């Protein structure tokens, strides 16, 4: 979700855009997520929480693998908006699903783990591409970050009930 934040100075140079245009790679994803959380929640009522969660996580991370192929800033921003829309199903479903499936006594600890995991994901989503950028291009940094995210999403999809 935040991989491009670590790459903003490089994106500005490599894509020959202003810093504010490069920043749209972050804003487009977070804005689309915000707009799509409620619709994703409604979809989870109709099609099932697990299905929406898996489609959301695998869809967003699969799209992340394609991000390095963007040739222009406009393409990258559009793909990031689509990625944000796809990932909206994850927060829309996760907390509700936990509250439905767990004993109320176990819920606070589970919610704490969810929030901690979300924070770790946000941090690693910045650190992984930043570290990779030290030894490779922004495209490979994005791909490496997306590959880690896809692997974890696939593992989660496999482990979910």
Where do the model's predicted regions map?
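Extracytoplasmic
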Residues: 1-19, 37
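Juxtamembrane helix-start elements in MFS-like secondary transporters
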Residues: 18-22, 26
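Residue-level signature of mid-helix packing/kink "hotspots" within the transmembrane helices
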Residues: 2, 30-38, 122-123
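Paired small-residue
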Residues: 63, 74-83
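Helix-loop-helix hairpin linking two adjacent transmembrane segments in secondary transporters
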Residues: 75, 104-105, 112-160
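Cytoplasmic helix-loop-helix junction between adjacent transmembrane helices
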Residues: 79-118
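Conserved MFS/SLC helix-loop-helix module at the cytosolic interface between two early adjacent transmembrane helices
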Residues: 35-71
């Amino acid at each position: 979700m935040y991989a491009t934040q670590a790459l903003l100075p490089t994106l500005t140079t490599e894509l020959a855009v202003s810093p504010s245009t490069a920043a749209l790679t972050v804003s487009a994803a977070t804005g689309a997520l915000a707009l799509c959380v409620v619709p994703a929640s409604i979809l989870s009522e109709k099609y099932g929480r697990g299905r929406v969660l898996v489609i959301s996580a695998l869809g967003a991370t699969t799209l992340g693998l394609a991000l390095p192929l963007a040739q222009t800033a406009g393409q990258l921003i559009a793909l990031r908006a689509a990625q944000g829309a796809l990932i909206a199903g994850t927060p829309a479903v996760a907390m509700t699903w936990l509250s439905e499936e767990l004993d109320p006594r176990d819920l606070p600890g589970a919610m704490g783990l969810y929030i901690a995991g979300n924070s770790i994901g946000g941090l690693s989503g910045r650190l992984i591409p930043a570290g990779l950028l030290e030894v490779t291009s922004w495209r490979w940094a994005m791909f490496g970050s997306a590959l880690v995210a896809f692997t974890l999403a696939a593992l989660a999809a496999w482990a979910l009930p």
